[in-house]
């Protein structure tokens, strides 16, 4: 199965609140500059890339609840698409060029429990990089809109 991108993104979409944090520093949770975009407050593309790599390779790939969805997935491509998707959702300069979520996840029989496991993994990565609560909630809120296109099984 190709669980490409987002069941993430969930996460991505789900927002994963994802991405965020600066790979090297604590984003603190407040974000300080009220005029800064979520992309800026997350630490821009390098920080998003670090979070996505940790999320996919250290969390999802080792999560017995959902790792089977990714067995035949091109991981570098998945990570690149997730970075672009999160970057775009966070009002950064990236453009997501992957499939829409409904098409990407068609026939995968993804249940709420699978989606929730993915979100838990994303949250763990965001916490690992000390992404602030405000940024996590904002990102996850934006990504959560994809839930119904991803979860199709009961």
PLM segments and residue spans:
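Repetitive helical segments and hydrophobic/amphipathic motifs
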Residues: 11-13
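C-terminal motif of bacterial Sec signal peptides marking the signal peptidase cleavage site
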Residues: 15-18
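Bacterial signal peptide processing site
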Residues: 20-23
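Short, low-complexity N-terminal intrinsically disordered segments enriched in polar/charged residues
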Residues: 26-44
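Heme-based O2/NO sensor domains and their adjacent alpha-helical segments
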Residues: 30-36, 49-127, 133, 139-140, ...
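Short terminal or interdomain "cap/linker" segment that borders an active site or interface and mediates
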Residues: 144-154
């Amino acid at each position: 199965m190709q669980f490409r991108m987002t069941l993430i993104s969930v996460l991505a979409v789900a927002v994963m609140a994802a991405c965020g944090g600066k790979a090297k520093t604590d984003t603190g949770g407040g974000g300080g500059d009220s005029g800064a975009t979520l992309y800026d407050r997350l630490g821009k593309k390098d920080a998003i890339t670090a979070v996505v790599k940790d999320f996919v390779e250290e969390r999802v790939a080792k999560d017995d609840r959902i790792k089977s969805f990714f067995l035949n997935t091109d991981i570098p491509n998945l990570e690149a698409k997730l970075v672009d998707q999160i970057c775009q959702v966070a009002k950064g300069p990236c453009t997501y060029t992957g499939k829409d979520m409904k098409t990407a996840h068609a026939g995968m029989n993804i249940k709420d429990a699978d989606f929730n496991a993915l979100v838990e993994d994303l949250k763990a990565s965001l916490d690992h990089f000390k992404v602030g609560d405000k940024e996590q909630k904002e990102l996850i809120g934006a990504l959560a809109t994809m839930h119904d296109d991803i979860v199709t099984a009961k």
